[in-house]
Amino acid sequence: MTFAVGQRWMSESENNLGLGLIVAIDRRTVTILFPASEEQRIYALNSAPLTRVLFQIGDEIAHHEGWKGNVLDILENNGVAFYLLKRQDNGEEITIQERDIAHQMTFSKPQDRLFTTQIDRNEHFTLRYQALTHQQAQFQSPLRGLRGIRAGLIPHQLHIAREVGQRTAPRVLLADEVGLGKTIEAGMILQQQLFAEKVERVLIIVPETLQHQWLVEMLRRFNLHFALFDEERCADFEDPASALWINPFNTESQIICALDWLCEKPKRVEQLLEAGFDMLIVDEAHHLGWSEHNPSLEYQLVEQLARQIPAVLLLTATPEQLGQESHFARLSLLDPDRFYDYQAFVQEQQQYQPVAEAVQSLLADKPLSAVEKNHISDLLSEQDVEPLLKVLDSQAHDEQKALARQELIDNLIDRHGTSRVLFRNTRQGVKGFPHRTYNQITLELPKQYNNAANVLAMLGEKGDNDSFYPEQMFQKLNPDARWWEFDPRLEWLITFLKNHREEKVLVICRHANTAIQLEQALREKEAIRAAVFHEKLSIVERDRAAAYFAQQEDGAQLLLSSSIGSEGRNFQFASHLVLFNLPDDPDLLEQCIGRLDRIGQRRDIQIHVPCFADTAQVVLARWYHEGLNAFEETCPMGMTLFEAHQTQLNKFLQNPTALEGFAEFVSLTRKQQHELKQALEKGRDRLLELNSNGGEQAQQLATDIAEQDGTTELVNFTLNLFDIIGVDQEDLGEKSIVITLASNMLVPDFPGLKEEGATVTFDRQLSLAREDVEFISWDHPLIRHGIDLITSGDIGKSAVSLLINKALPAGTLLLEMIYVVEAQAPKGLQLTRFLPPTPIRLLLDQKGNNLAEQVSFSALQKQLKPIGKNMANKVVKMVRPNIEQLVKLSEQKIVAQAQQIIHNAQQLADQTLSAELNRLTALQAVNKNIRQDEVDALDNIRSQSLAQLQQATWRLDSLRVIVSNKE
C-alpha cells in the first residue's frame, strides 16, 4: 500500500465509519479521520484493513459543499487524486482534490461496493434476488390490493372492489343491503386506488356515531391509519398570538370526520376545500336530504366537496323506492352533468323496469314473449340482439342457448342506465345468511326501580328513556348503588350462561358503566369469565378483550359491550346475542344484531331480550317484533315507519299499562311494513343485481385469492426476511407467531412493525376469529415495506461465495449479475402493471459465456458456501481486473434481453389500454353514464404510458463473485 496525506480510504472492517481521510503518516502507522462519524483510527502501515477509494471517468461524485458532478478526467500528484468534474447543477467544469469529496459519500453501485470492501453475506444477496422476483410478480398480479384484507372472501364484495377499484377517479354509489359489507367494499376500492398510487389524500365523512367504527375497520381490516378530526384537534393548530397559520387538514393525508360537526363549522369546510383531497367517502348517504328547491345543509356540504374531489364513493343502504327524489340527488352528486333533470331520470328508470322483467325470464330459462323481445330491442341495437334471439328461438343445443342467453344479459348490463355508478346486492340475491330467532324473557320489575322512578318523578328529574335503562336511573339517586344485587336480569343471565357453558355469548348494554358493573357482578357471584368492551377503552385494549372472547380454550364465555363500543366489530363465531338494554330505535337495533348477523355467520342467531313486565321495554319489543318483524329479519324500512309513527308510539311508551288501541297500532304497522316490503321486492332491479353480484367470475376471483393464502413461497420468504432483517420470532402455536424488533437489526427501522411487536398469522380464518392477530399476505405492509426495504437499499448488492464443484478447476471465476429493467414515470400511470422492476440474471464465466439458462439460481445456490470477509476482500482484490472486464461485457449482453422486455411491455400496454378505451368508447354511445372525462383520461393514460415505456432503462442492481474449489 502507498499512503499519502489527503487520500480517501474505506475501512474494510467498519464500513459504517464512512469515507476516511489520511491526516498523518509516520514510519509504522497511518492515521485516518472519518469525519462523517467523527471517529479517528490509527492502523499499522503494513497490515491496515483499508481499501483505496478511487473514482472512474463517468462516476458521480458529491462535493462537501452539497453539489454533485460527473468525472471527466483524473490526474494524480504525489499520490493524491485530482478529479475534473462537470457540475450537474450548472454545467461548470471544475477540478477538485479528493479531500473535497463529501464525507458522507456512499457507494450504491454494486461494483463500487464490492471494490470498497462493502461486501454482503451470501444469504443477503439471495434475499435481494428473491425480493426482486417477488416484487415483479406482485406488481403484475391481478389480485393485488384484494388479497390482504382481513375479512372473508365474499365474491360480490370482491367483484365490486375489482370493478370499481381499477377505474380512474371512480364515482359510485354503493347501496348493498345491511350486512352485506359496504364498508369492506369501500375499503377494498380505496386499497386498490392507494396501491396503484391513483389517490393519496383521502377524506371519509360519516355520522358522529360511526367515526370509531370506520377508524377500527380501516385499521384492522386494511392496515390503513386514519386520523379522527374534530374541533378540539383543529383548534390545536390555531394560535392567535402566532403569525404562522396552519391548515389542520394538511397535517394528515387520511382523515375521518363527522358530518354534523362540519355542518356546524363552515370554516372547517373551507379548510377542507383548501387542503384538497383525491378521494371522498361518505357513509350513510341517505341522510343527505334533497328536494328540488330545498336541498339540506348536509347535501350542499357534500356537493361542494364532491365538485372538487375527483373520486367519490357514497354508501347507503336505503333503496331508491323509499325516496326516488333523494336517490336521484345522490346520483347527481356523482355526475351532475348526467343527472341534471329529475323528471328525465324518472322516465328513464321506468324504461328499464320492463327490461328487468325480461331478464327474469332469461334467468329462469323461460321463452321470451313478444313484448319482452320488443323491450330488449328498444335498449339494444338490432345487430346485437337479433342473432342472439334467433339462437334462443331455434333448436340449438342447450349449451349454445346458455351462451346466447348470457351474452344477451351481459349486453343489457353494459347498457343499463346506472350500472356503472350504482351497485346494489340484496340478501335475497346473495343468500347464505342465517335465520334469526327472537326470545323474549319477561321479568317482574323490582320494587327498587319502581320506587326510584317515583322519587325522580317527584323531583322532576325523570327522563323519557329512564325506563329503558333502569339501572342508570337507579344510580341517579346514588351513583354507588349496587343495582345488580336485586336486578332479576342478572340472575336470568347467570342461569342462561350455566345452561350454555360451551356457547359464546355477546351481551350488549346501552352504557359502558352497565357493562363494567355487570362484569364485576358476574365475577364476584359466579367467577364467570367475561371480557368487557366499551368506548372508554383504547383500540389496543378492545383488541385484547376481543381476543380473550375469541379464544376457544381458556377464553371468555361472554363479551359485555356497550352499544357504541361494539361498533366496527363483528363476532360471527358467537351465535347468542343478549340485548341487556333494548335499543330505542330500529337502526340501533339492527346495528346490534349486525354484530353477529353478517355474511359469513354459519349458525342461526338466537336473540334474547330480558325486559320488565308492564314497562316501555315490553311495549317497544312487541312493536319491533309484531309490527316491524325487526328481530327476525332485516328491516330496511324500519326507521321510515319509526319516524312516521313516533308520536303515536311515544304515547304508548310513556303509559305502558294503558294500551287501548295498541293492538290496532301494531297491526297497522305490520300492514305498512308488508306493503313496503312488497314494493321493494317488486322494484328489485335484477339487472342491477346481476351486475353488482359478479356471478361465476366473482366466485373464481374468491377461489384464486384463497389459493394464494399462506402459500409455502410466502411463508418461506417472510420468515427469511424476518431472520435477515433482525426480527425476533416466537411460535405461539395455533398457526400464529409473535414478532418483535431485535436489538441487532440490520436496518434502523422496519416500517409497519410497531415497537411493541405484533402477533401474526398466515391463516385468514384465524385472523378473523382473533382481532389481535394480523393476517400476513403479499399485500400486508410488513411484506410490501420489507421488499421495498431490500430492493431500494444496499442490502445484498455485492457478495462473494465459494462454489464447491469437483468438476471445475479450483479458482474458476464466475460472475453472477442481476440487472433490473424499469420505467420512471408518474405514479398514476400504473406502469408497473406492464413493466414492474424486472430482474434479468446473467451468469458469466471467465470467457464471457452466459450460463444463466443452463444453471438456475436455485441449483447454483445449493452448491455455494459462505466465505469470510477478510478472505472475500482478498479474492476481490486478486480478480478485480477480471470483474471489471466481465461487468463491461455484461453491459453489451444485457441490451437485447432488456429491449425485448421493454418491447413486450409496450405491446401489453397498447393492447390492454386500447381494448379498455375501445370498449368504453363503444359503450358511451349506448350508455350515458360513461363520462367523457373518463374516456379522455383513459386516452391520455394510454398515450403517456406508451411514451414513458419508450424511455425505460436498465441498471446493474447487484452482483456476486463466485470462485470454485474442490471442497
Swiss-Prot record:
It holds the Pfam family Helicase_C. HAMAP family: Helicase_RapA (MF_01821). Transcription regulator that activates transcription by stimulating RNA polymerase (RNAP) recycling in case of stress conditions such as supercoiled DNA or high salt concentrations. Probably acts by releasing the RNAP, when it is trapped or immobilized on tightly supercoiled DNA. Does not activate transcription on linear DNA. Probably not involved in DNA repair. Transmembrane segments: none annotated. Gene3D superfamilies: 2.30.30.140, 2.30.30.930, 3.30.360.80, 6.10.140.1500, 6.10.140.2230, P-loop containing nucleotide triphosphate hydrolases, Tandem AAA-ATPase domain. SUPFAM superfamilies: P-loop containing nucleoside triphosphate hydrolases (SSF52540). This is RNA polymerase-associated protein RapA. The gene is rapA. Its EC number is 3.6.4.-. The keyword Transcription regulation applies. Residues 489-660 form the Helicase C-terminal domain. The keyword Cell inner membrane does not apply. Residues 163-337 form the Helicase ATP-binding domain. ATP binds at residues 176-183. PANTHER family: DNA ANNEALING HELICASE AND ENDONUCLEASE ZRANB3 FAMILY MEMBER (PTHR45766), SWI_SNF-RELATED MATRIX-ASSOCIATED ACTIN-DEPENDENT REGULATOR OF CHROMATIN SUBFAMILY A-LIKE PROTEIN 1 (PTHR45766:SF6). A motif (DEAH box) lies at residues 283-286. GO terms for molecular function: ATP binding; DNA binding; helicase activity; hydrolase activity, acting on acid anhydrides. Interacts with the RNAP. Has a higher affinity for the core RNAP than for the holoenzyme. Its ATPase activity is stimulated by binding to RNAP. GO terms for biological process: regulation of DNA-templated transcription.
